[in-house]
Amino acid sequence: MVLASGSGGFAYFLPAAAIAFGSTGQAVNVPSPSAMASPSMLFTPSPSALPQVKGAFTVLLLGSDDDSKFTSDHVLTQSMILVRVVPSTKQVTMLSIPRDLYVPLSTGGYGKIDGAYSYGRAAAAIATVQQNFGVKINDYVWIGLLGLIHLIDAIGGIDVVTSNPVLDDYYPADVNSRYPFSYQRVAVLAGPQHLTGTSALQYVRSRHNDLQSDFGRSQRQQQVLLAIRQKAKQISPEDIPALAAALNNEVKTSISIDRTASLVALASTFDNPDAIRQIVLLPPYTHGGGPGGSINPNWNLILPLVHQYFP
């Protein structure tokens, strides 16, 4: 596990949600957490005993492959991050869920958790996370590859300091490409970097030559969320229509339009550098050796950790 403090995950999804006018308020039935009926269940998850706090809420952030190798109805989620926001204490917790985690799926059977969305869109992804982790999700925000590119370009790029270079000779050349199954070489050097939307996507998406494998990518994704948050502080309600046009409906969310203004105002109050916990489920919380290159969860360790922060 990596547990760190910072400032930013909360405000990442707020501008994304606020400018998703064309896809805002999509109805998604979010059931209460419950054990899945399966004769081969590895465990029976129970809802967290953490008490509900007035005004607090949990959002599932989903970042998808939506490039030309996939149809719009069958995309994987390269990124799944639970965000818990407690306005009364200005506390935020971000939990990165490994995309290769081998779990029971809400639609039936077992598979990598990144496939849940492809079988049943947001409702299936939400139900799978709820049922395995025993948490209650209030809302979701989904963003595709082009959506991330356009969002970051619309706010003028982001600034990060990379601790290690990202060098990938097998990065998919599948965004706006005539040859979606080809590869290209990408590089993001170590040190201070100003990233455009395309280079930021390369930074968070690359999964080759990282000594920490997919866990390193999870840490990079959270780092980019923090950088987006820095730029998002400059966004005012008057900027939202132009940003919405730039995204061109490439964000989907269950957060209704009438909530966005109050949420943007709330986000501006989260300026404490210690306001957010960042959690990545490194070994021994997970371990390799699962079917098809998946990783296995150690629920005896994961669930107590998750239920410290997520009801």
PLM feature spans:
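Non-catalytic, solvent-exposed segments at the cell envelope interface
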Residues: 3-311
